[in-house]
Amino acid sequence: KKKDVLISANVYMGAEGITKALEEGANLVITGRVSDPALTIGPLVYEFGWNIDDNPDQMGQAVLAGHLLECAGQVTGGYFADPGYKDVPDLWKLGFPLIEIDETGAFTVTKVEGSGGLVSVDTCKEQMIYEIHNPKAYLTPDATADFSKVTFRQIGENQVRAEHATTHGRPETLKVSVGYKDCFIGEGEISYGGSN
């Protein structure tokens, strides 16, 4: 019986709980399993008073911002680096990304000043397509994002402007991560190398 082997089931929730906690005065929000973009969407909805269901362009930009931030140093060159082909300066002191966003949803990707790494159109493009399956329908609990018309523009050193993400309502179902007992053990490793 399958029910006898289930160990866990975690539904990926959206930003509403985060926004509510902030509205109630929380300085720190601890959540259960939420989607990665929800960690950005929640504070933006709170700060700018957005309605998740009525602002498709703002929400598209919020989902994109959260998606670019979700893996931290990936968008600042950590995953992009391929020594000798795609060089990233001072990779050993990789800086984490920052998003500077306004109430319209327009934003710039940058990084901590003085840190290593690289924020470029290419690092942003590479992170945008990471784990999304379909650029026209990236499913999150808060919205189905459409990244098919997104543009990235280098506006300064380690500064990239991101525009034109939108959404098409919420998905009908939510993602669930299920763990079950089945006598399988896996091990993985990622190695990086390059010509240098």
What are these model-predicted stretches?
Residues 57-161:
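A conserved active-site cap/scaffold subdomain adjacent to cofactor or substrate pockets
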Residues 6-13, 56-60, 113-120, 168, ...:
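Catalytic cores of large soluble enzymes that bind and process phosphate-bearing ligands
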Residues 45-52, 59:
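Short acidic, glycine/proline-enriched helix-loop-strand junctions
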Residues 1-42, 48, 68, 121-141:
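Alpha/propeptide regions of enzymes that mature by internal proteolysis
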Residues 45-48, 102-111, 180-190:
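Short acidic (Asp/Glu) and glycine-rich catalytic loops that position anionic groups and cofactors
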Residues 2-3, 23-27, 31-36, 60-65, ...:
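Short coil/turn connectors at secondary-structure junctions
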Residues 37-39, 85, 118, 184:
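Flexible loop/turn segments at secondary-structure boundaries
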Residues 141, 146-196:
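C-terminal non-catalytic interaction/assembly regions of soluble proteins
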